[in-house]
A protein has these predicted regions:
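Short alpha-helix plus adjacent loop in nuclease-associated cores
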Residues: 55, 104, 111-149, 207, ...
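Low-complexity, acidic/Ser/Thr- and charged residue-rich accessory regions of DNA metabolism proteins
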Residues: 346, 350, 387-482
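Phosphate-backbone recognition surface of nucleic-acid-processing proteins
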Residues: 235, 300-303, 309-393, 397
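A short, charged helix-loop
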Residues: 138-161, 250-256
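Glycine-rich, often acidic, oxyanion-interacting loops/wings at catalytic, nucleic-acid
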Residues: 167-297, 426
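Gly/Thr-rich phosphate-binding beta-strand-loop-beta motif of the actin/hexokinase/Hsp70
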Residues: 18-45, 137
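Charged, flexible boundary elements
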Residues: 1-22, 283-284
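Nucleic-acid-processing active sites and adjacent nucleic-acid-binding tracks
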Residues: 47-86
Length: 482
């Protein structure tokens, strides 16, 4: 029977170092308080006794070599083996990431501790100095509280960089839309409402009209044929009817003072150009995201009906490598999609279910809840039915389906198989599964073709490519890529 520890938050890697050492005195803890120019370092043993007082180390290659040299000297002096040494500091920012990575490349174990937890370990809560912060970090490391296996590495790290960059560009795009609304409300009130102008807001026909000589008076005076030609070249359907509706509406709105029109038009033209640039950058990032997603286990999330590339990439990037990730129960708490529970008064005491915790990975939570909403609208039949049942029962359906989706997704990524309906998971015939694969294959292929990443996704060296080869061999079918 597996022994369970009451210290569930302790790092397995750090616990193994303590177990291998003869005594905790033969463990060297290198606590680091990162900074942009000079880090503060302190050596102590596993019992908490300081072996070397805090000293500074430059955030340079020379600083890395100097620190390693000092560690070797302390190991020789205190007769501590190299494999019983580990480094640790608060989850570092971008300016210290290369420093920690250099230590890992030299073969050292580098742990990261949560800054908020480290703050609670300090002796003095009122003040904050490098030395006080260092003591809190050292206590966290001695208590084996640290993350030694970053899940976001390699392809997962590259994917997370792209996902978070795209997320910020989407925020900028929303901000730009709001600014354009403010300008349009003065030049041509109501133009961005489809029921008024007949044009869907911020699509190409709408942008073409806004980027040059745009005001209610100018749209009203413009020749009908010129406006029809402009809308037709922009790809608008039924341009004649839309041009007529637009000019009729322009004759019935309030117009701005003439002395302000030129300035507002210049501002709007710049906004349209910036908006186009942001949209082009987002499209480029999505194509790159699809290529990196295809090289990870997260590609299997795309096989769930209702889940597209953006949602699959977002969840995969924040979870990281499923092989090194914690159990699903920990991930659910990490994502902030499980309510807090309070119970007291013995076995007969009542249980209070509160709201979800605010301390979580908000980005992962956002992508999971969005995925749950999509599954409730467009997902597999069993998931849509479950979403409706939870909603009818007064539960938070999106949170419930998000937890179920996370369990399903982790199982798919760890076992390298696509999503199967409930009736095909157990006691299903070979013919039933063969038919399911042949029916769903065109839809799966179209998802990847949308981003031009289908050849990468189904390459023999990538997870979906290996799954495709296995299915073709076992079920004697052909799943064509072209």
């Amino acid at each position: 029977m597996k022994k369970k520890s009451i210290f569930q938050q302790q790092s397995q890697e750090l616990m193994r170092i303590y177990e291998e050492a003869a005594t905790s005195k033969k463990v060297l803890v290198v606590a680091m308080d990162y900074a942009k120019k000079e880090h503060t370092i302190m050596f102590c043993n596993g019992d908490g006794y300081i072996l070397r007082k805090p000293f500074g180390v430059k955030n340079t290659p020379e600083g890395v070599n100097y620190l390693i040299k000092q560690v070797h000297k302390s190991c020789n002096y205190h007769k501590i083996k190299r494999k019983h040494v580990f480094y640790g500091g608060e989850d570092c920012g971008s300016y210290t990431e290369n420093f920690a990575q250099c230590l890992r490349e030299h073969g050292w174990l580098v742990a990261g501790v949560n800054a908020q937890d480290a703050k609670k370990q300090r002796e003095n809560i009122q003040a904050s100095t490098d030395r006080l912060d260092l003591l809190g970090i050292a206590r966290m490391l001695i208590n084996r509280r640290g993350n030694c296996s970053p899940c976001q590495s390699g392809a997962y790290r590259n994917l997370r960089t792209l996902v978070r960059h795209r997320r910020k560009l989407v925020v900028l795009t929303t901000e730009e839309r709001c600014r354009m609304h403010c300008v349009v409300d003065r030049l041509f009130p109501g133009f961005l409402a489809e029921r008024n102008s007949g044009l869907f807001p911020f699509h190409e026909p709408s942008l073409r009209v806004m980027e040059g000589r745009f005001s209610a008076a100018q749209i009203k005076r413009r020749k009908r044929a010129t406006l029809v030609d402009l809308l037709a070249r922009a790809g608008a359907q039924e341009p004649t009817q839309k041009a007529k509706k637009l000019q009729e509406y322009a004759a019935n709105v309030l117009q701005p003072p003439k002395e302000y029109i030129a300035t507002l038009q210049t501002s709007l033209t710049q906004h349209v150009g910036l908006y186009r640039c942001l949209k082009n950058n987002i499209s480029s990032l999505e194509r790159e995201m699809a290529i990196w997603l295809a090289q990870t286990q997260g590609a299997f999330l795309m096989t769930v009906r209702g889940i597209g590339m953006v949602l699959a990439a977002g969840v995969t990037a924040e979870i990281g490598n499923p092989a090194t990730q914690k159990p699903v129960n920990n991930l659910v708490s990490y994502a902030g999609i499980i309510p807090r529970v309070s119970q007291t008064g013995g076995s007969e005491g009542s249980t209070y279910v509160g709201s979800v915790a605010k301390r979580c990975n908000r980005i992962l939570k956002d992508y999971l809840v969005q995925s749950a909403s999509h599954l409730g609208l467009h997902g597999a039949d069993d998931l849509m039915a479950d979403h409706k049942r939870r909603d009818a029962a007064g539960q938070h359906a999106n949170y419930g389906i998000a937890r179920r989706y996370l369990r399903i997704g982790m199982h798919m990524m760890r076992h390298c198989h696509i999503y199967l309906p409930e009736d095909l998971r157990e006691n299903s015939t070979l013919e039933a599964r063969r038919e399911y694969y042949q029916v769903t294959w065109p839809y799966l292929l179209d998802k990847w073709k949308k981003y031009g990443a289908h050849e990468v996704a189904f390459a023999p060296e990538n997870p979906l490519g290996q799954w495709r080869d296995m299915v073709q061999d076992v079920y004697n079918i052909t799943l064509r890529i072209k």
